[in-house]
Amino acid sequence: MATITPQKGSQSEVGVSNTDPLNWGNAVESLKGSHLEEVKGMVAEYREAVIHVGGGETLTVSKVAAVANQYLQAKVDLSESAREGVDSSCKWIVDNIDKGIPIYGVTTGFGANSNRQTQEGLALQKEMVRFLNCAIFGYQTELSHTLPKSATRAAMLVRVNTLLQGYSGIRFEILEAITKLLNHNVTPILPLRGTITASGDLIPLSYIAALLIGRRNSKAVGPSGESLNAKEAFHLAGVDGGFFELKPKEGLALVNGTAVGSGVASMVLFEANILALLAEVLSAVFAEVMQGKPEFTDHLIHKLKYHPGQIEAAAIMEHILDGSSYVKNAKLQQPDPLQKPRKDRYALVTSPQWLGPQIEIIRFSTKSIEREINSVNDNPLIDVTRNKAVSGGNFQGTPIGVSMDNARLAVASIGKLIFAQFTELANDLYNNGLPSNLSVGRNPSLDYGFKASEVAMAAYCSELQYLANPVTSHVQSTEQHNQDVNSLGLISALKTVEAIEILKLMSSTYLVALCQAIDLRHLEEIFKNTVKNTVSRVALKTLTTEDKEETNPFRFSEEELLKVVDREYVFSYIDDPLNVRYPLMPKLKQVLYEQAHTSVINDKNVSLLVFEKIGAFEDELKSLLPKEVESARVAYENGNPATPNRIKECRSYPLYKFVREELGIRLLTGEKALSPDEEFEKVYTAMCQAKIIDPILECLEDWNGVPIPI
């Protein structure tokens, strides 16, 4: 089997090896280890201040995201060791033109017009850039058709990485110029639409070429968002020597590649990996606040299903629940089996089975895109060692289109699970005692909590499910039927950007709702203790008898009364605990009447006057309980709760702490003027700025990477 040898000065660690000629082994090897460890590695790379390109360095989606991100904008460092290989392919082009050897796109036309011949190589490259500059930007309209700045930066980095490998026939100085633009935050304006990512992303990449040669229609954006022409862009970036006159093949090298699609895909997948991990943690928190049975994470269940994504998702949830104060408390106080279903609903109990395949898809898509961004994907390729130009179809961006379609479906599935969990959480028929809409105000008639938020979540989820439809099934034959199959890679990547944004909207809303539920569980515990203590005191005061000759029918009533309090959901009555339409007071009185009635019938020493004690009990409770409940609520609101919040003893606490302390998000209540959007916006912004990463990882920092032994 022949060895594919990198040309001198080009990248050496990305290619196919003799021992793995089909590269399947390398593909499998890249998926070893846990998804969590891979995400940790991605985060570490994302936070590197300088991204080294060339000289054997492998580009990753996280490195691309770091350079693209407007909040980080890591610097790019070109490896000087790549210069020789890059320049040698450029020299090969010039030498072979002089020999009269025909070379596609250098001495011939393009695509379906490749039968045309020319010896005017410089003019041909110039004309190619001109005719490819055919996009519409809509500068004078409300709707912009401009590629986001971050996506353009990603494309520039990926294109430089490809061209540095020395198979493209372009000068090193041009790559240095693109790098200077990146490092000085000067970004060419590229069109949002117009590419099918089949002969590469020809049209958008042509606008980078247009800026480099100083075309009058080219524009750029400066560090502060200011509009720049080509001359101003070069000056600001410190590119000396004036505009470039493209040599034969250099224009084609710049435009004939998949960098825009794969650059956007890299950004998308970095976020998708983070959001997938977040969904696992949020599902565990959901189990905590829903008082779910933790056995759904038992390793035996998932070991027998074999799927690695499912096994890891379950192990992560198991780890969080194993350290949960909620779970430990539930084991101490087994709930009445009549109060809740024997088995939790699917959104909880099958969350590992649901999330597992999505994680696998996202991981595989990530590796596919990382192969693409490290590939040489223009045409023709210059093989200096064999002294020939080789024409092929590496510009076909099918790995991008397919990976993005698959990843978008996974993102939509994660969103569907989040929506199912959210609707269960907000519905008092299913949420095991939490108030309807997660309302926390004193008067539920004037506090509708997350009611509208659920409607918004339905809208988000519907749009997300629509976006899950494939792009790659909509291919159109074009360019005189030369490009009769095409990947639609960038289109699919941009649709996945939309999907990621919607998932962030959903995750932001859901995270705030979960924190609300955590605090409601805290209030629930405080109120329940308050009610039990008050009932005990009132019973002791009003139901005892001083006559030793008289049998007290209520001598065992306190225990039964407290059982009533334990059985009833606190939020079903706490806004008006003595209201006869609410369950608490009628059931307390029922216990006393039954005991009194039985005693009067069976024991002649019991007087009918015992029924008066029930009235005294009711009157005393009406006098005392509302005051005690309000006092407990005020103490909670003032930061002095009678009972500490259990979340502080949970492994999920870092996420709660991030929301409540770092972002300063408080309980949402109709008693305050604060609207939900003000708080949701804070979480969404934090997600966009990647600030959510550390709290997620802190929830899992002491996980050893393996399930709890069976």
UniProtKB/Swiss-Prot annotation:
Keywords: Cytoplasm, Lyase, Phenylalanine catabolism, Phenylpropanoid metabolism
EC top class named in words: lyase
The enzyme's E.C. designation: 4.3.1.24
Cross-link (5-imidazolinone (Ala-Gly)): A198-G200
PTM summary: Contains an active site 4-methylidene-imidazol-5-one (MIO), which is formed autocatalytically by cyclization and dehydration of residues Ala-Ser-Gly.
Entry's localization field: Cytoplasm
Organism: Phaseolus vulgaris
Pathway connected to this protein: Phenylpropanoid metabolism; trans-cinnamate biosynthesis; trans-cinnamate from L-phenylalanine: step 1/1
Presence of the UniProt keyword S-adenosyl-L-methionine in the record: no
UniProt entry tagged with the keyword Lyase: yes
Main location class: cytoplasm
Protein's UniProt name: Phenylalanine ammonia-lyase class 3
GO biological process: cinnamic acid biosynthetic process; L-phenylalanine catabolic process
InterPro entries, per the entry: Aromatic_Lyase, Fumarase/histidase_N, L-Aspartase-like, Phe/His_NH3-lyase_AS, Phe_NH3-lyase, Phe_NH3-lyase_shielding_dom_sf
SUPFAM superfamilies reported for this sequence: L-aspartase-like
Region (Disordered) residue spans: 1-21
Quaternary structure (record): Homotetramer.
GO molecular function, a single term: phenylalanine ammonia-lyase activity
Residue positions where 2,3-didehydroalanine (Ser) is found in the record: S199
Catalytic activity: L-phenylalanine = (E)-cinnamate + NH4(+)
Homology family: Belongs to the PAL/histidase family.
Pfam families, alphabetized: Lyase_aromatic
